[in-house]
Amino acid sequence: MHDIPKQIPLANNHISVDCVVIGFDGEQLKVLLINRIGEENGKVYRDMKLPGSLIYMDEDLDEAAQRVLFELTGIRNVNLMQFKAFGSKNRTSNPKDVHWLERAMQSKVERIVTIAYLSMVKIDRALDKNLDEFQACWVCLLYTSPS
């Protein structure tokens, strides 16, 4: 029998989806963000992030993206297209992000591989209808020229 050499431990990966929804309101391009409230070192913080979350064991990636977008923004039935995977080993180096995700998911999170989805939409009343209820909002994209 051959001895199997000791190897670096396998990662305990979590898979998440992030939804990048770009909207046009007739005047400006905007991105859909959600408010995130967290706590770090006993201090409450607020910031904004893309709608995203971990996937469930019984759903595929496309189903997860639609579910996450609906649960976090109330928006459904938009065409989401998978466009990139983010899997850097250092992605979870920001303790604030890891702590927030662990509290939200009630689970220990080590490494996260995120599949990003993109959608382009026309912003209308139907898309704006429930955003306040979900603490989501459209934020103008600012264009800057490279220095």
Please place each PLM-identified region on the residue numbering:
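Short connector loops at helix/strand junctions that flank enzyme active sites
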Residues: 14, 77, 110-114
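Short, charged/polar micro-motifs that form catalytic or ligand-binding hotspots
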Residues: 9, 51-59, 103, 107
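N-terminal strand-loop-strand
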Residues: 4-48
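Active-site-adjacent beta-strand/loop module that shapes the phosphate/pyrophosphate-binding cleft
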Residues: 90-127
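Short, charged, solvent-exposed linker or helix-capping segments at domain edges/interfaces
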Residues: 126-135
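Active-site cradle of extracellular carbohydrate-active enzymes
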Residues: 140
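Conserved small/polar residues in nucleotide/adenosyl-binding loops
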Residues: 143-147
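The catalytic Nudix box helix
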Residues: 50-86, 117
